[in-house]
């Protein structure tokens, strides 16, 4: 018997049965309890979703921008009214502490919808004079039907981040949440419908990567926005291009450097490093997992980090005092433990954690102790590859040039940060770091106003910020001739 029963698709403004005959299960990562059995979409279901999205998008785009803005603002109100209930659902599905899901997941999703609701009326074109008798004007028009493919670490936040700019610009979206955390996207769909979004404008299709592939290759979809791993992102991008040259936004993985210089406030630096590695049990794409520390302050910094790690409160996600929960799935647990074993085998010095937690109530959950490795080398797997778990690697350095060169020696380029009291060095270093999201003397905040996305293999395009609206519209140029037409022949 599951907690939430059978979960269906959401198409054309209502829950709908899938036609595949297939289902998959989703579990509470803290207890192993069966949360729900979820119907998997078929190719026919994806076709249904696209057809309803096309119909709904025509109605949605025909509304005035102010009408769309008001409806999106109503969705924001409903999200905030139901914050606690949605936070509990997200806690059960992801394993995150309730204190975190109440304060972050729904709140930041609602903030982004509110932000784009305010910008919906600001989508405008340009007027370009050519000569006294002729001018050009441009229109920013919606793309049509967009697909959003989410990751399992921030299910409802990602659904909001992808749908908000799409809907604000007059598009429809078909969203596929991760099969690991599939529940909250359905609640967002219900809220959009209740707020007045026309049927079909936000559909949810459930399933594994095969459903994502169907969306990526579908000729009726104009854009795909994907959040997930690099290799899967490359497959999505390939399908999107080969099928119909779709627009793409890719928010992919990272192996982000945090550089602590010898003039840094070490207490502040330790606070930043611990947050940048252990928030959400390390399951954050922007985590600063490569911590470069200037040699002169390394020992003092490590001492402060370990003191803070010892204060982390690992526990049941439902306990308001817990600030560190389980990993999201058994597969992720095995992956993280494999990397920890690799770090030990390659000679990294284990300073904290390094094992699965199995005592008391941890036994049935996917818990790994917050882990810190010292004296790491750049060639170690734990330093080179994205782990997506609570594993910090500390790497000593001598000079600024050395730190920058080593920080940039990666195929990733999602995030980076520096901690220093020297303003000139802070900006100089940040300008040399090859990353799309950077922080000085802080880490992790990604407000609605801030464009986020990666360099190199960490992504294409941006989410959030004004610039993202450009990625959900296309420009139509119109020349107007007021004078006599001059024939060529």
From Swiss-Prot:
Positions of the record's site feature: Seems to be a necessary countercharge to the potassium cations: 247
Cell inner membrane is among the record's keywords: no
Modified-residue entries (Cysteine sulfenic acid (-SOH)), positions: 285
GO molecular function list: betaine-aldehyde dehydrogenase (NAD+) activity; metal ion binding
Cited InterPro entries: Ald_DH/histidinol_DH, Ald_DH_C, Ald_DH_CS_CYS, Ald_DH_CS_GLU, Ald_DH_N, Aldehyde_DH_dom, BADH
PROSITE patterns: ALDEHYDE_DEHYDR_CYS, ALDEHYDE_DEHYDR_GLU
Active site per the UniProt annotation: 162 (charge relay system), 251 (proton acceptor), 285 (nucleophile), 463 (charge relay system)
Cofactor note: Binds 2 potassium ions per subunit.
Broad class of enzyme this protein falls into: oxidoreductase
Reaction catalyzed: betaine aldehyde + NAD(+) + H2O = glycine betaine + NADH + 2 H(+)
Residues reported in the UniProt entry to bind NAD(+): 150-152, 176-179, 229-232, 253, 285, 386
Enzyme Commission (EC) number: 1.2.1.8
Cofactor(s) annotated in UniProt: K(+)
This protein's record includes keyword NADP: yes
Pfam family for this entry, one: Aldedh
Keywords: Metal-binding, NAD, NADP, Oxidation, Oxidoreductase, Potassium
Subunit text: Dimer of dimers.
Family: Belongs to the aldehyde dehydrogenase family.
Alphabetized HAMAP family for the sequence: BADH
Protein name according to UniProt: Betaine aldehyde dehydrogenase
Species this chain originates from: Burkholderia pseudomallei (strain K96243)
Gene that encodes it: betB
């Amino acid at each position: 018997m599951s907690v939430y029963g059978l979960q269906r698709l959401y198409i054309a403004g209502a829950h709908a049965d899938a036609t595949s005959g297939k289902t998959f299960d989703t579990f509470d990562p803290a207890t192993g309890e069966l949360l729900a059995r979820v119907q998997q979409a078929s190719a026919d279901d994806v076709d249904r979703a696209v057809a309803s999205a096309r119909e709904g998008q025509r109605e949605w785009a025909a509304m005035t921008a102010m009408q769309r803005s008001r409806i999106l603002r109503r969705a924001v109100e409903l999200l905030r009214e139901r914050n606690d209930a949605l936070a509990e659902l997200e806690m059960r599905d992801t394993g995150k502490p309730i204190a975190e899901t109440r304060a972050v997941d729904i709140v930041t999703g609602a903030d982004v919808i509110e932000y784009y609701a305010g910008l919906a009326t600001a989508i405008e074109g340009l007027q370009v004079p050519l000569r006294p008798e002729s001018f050009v004007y441009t229109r920013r028009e919606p793309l049509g039907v967009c697909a959003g493919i989410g990751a399992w670490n921030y299910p409802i936040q990602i659904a909001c981040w992808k749908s908000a700019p799409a809907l604000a610009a007059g598009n429809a979206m078909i969203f596929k949440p991760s099969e690991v955390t599939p529940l909250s996207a359905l609640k967002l769909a219900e809220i959009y419908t209740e707020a007045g979004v026309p049927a079909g404008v936000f559909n949810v299709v459930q399933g594994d990567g095969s459903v994502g592939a169907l969306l990526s290759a579908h000729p009726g979809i104009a854009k795909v926005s994907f959040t997930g791993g690099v290799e899967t992102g490359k497959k999505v991008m390939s399908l999107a291009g080969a099928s119909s040259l779709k627009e793409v936004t890719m928010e992919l993985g990272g192996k982000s450097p945090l550089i602590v210089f010898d003039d840094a406030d070490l207490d502040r630096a330790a606070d930043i490093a611990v947050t940048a590695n252990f928030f959400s049990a390390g399951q954050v794409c922007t985590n600063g997992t490569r911590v470069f520390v200037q040699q002169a302050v390394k020992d003092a910094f490590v001492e402060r980090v370990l003191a803070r790690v010892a204060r982390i409160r690992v526990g049941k996600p439902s306990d308001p005092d817990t600030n560190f929960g389980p990993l999201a799935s058994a597969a992720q647990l095995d992956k993280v433990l494999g990397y920890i074993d690799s770090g030990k085998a390659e000679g990294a010095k284990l300073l904290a954690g390094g094992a699965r937690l199995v005592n008391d109530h941890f036994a049935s959950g996917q818990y790994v102790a917050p882990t810190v490795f010292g004296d790491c080398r750049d060639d170690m797997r734990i330093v080179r590859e994205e782990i997506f778990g609570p594993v910090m690697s500390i790497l000593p350095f001598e000079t600024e040039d050395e730190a920058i060169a080593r920080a940039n020696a990666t195929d990733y380029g999602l995030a980076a940060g520096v901690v220093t009291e020297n303003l000139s060095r802070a900006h100089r270093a940040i300008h040399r770091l090859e990353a799309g999201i950077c922080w000085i003397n802080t880490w992790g905040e990604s407000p609605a106003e801030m464009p986020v996305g990666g360099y190199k293999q960490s992504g294409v395009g941006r989410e959030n910020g004004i610039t993202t609206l450009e990625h959900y519209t296309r420009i139509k140029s119109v020349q107007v001739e007021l004078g006599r037409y001059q024939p060529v022949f």
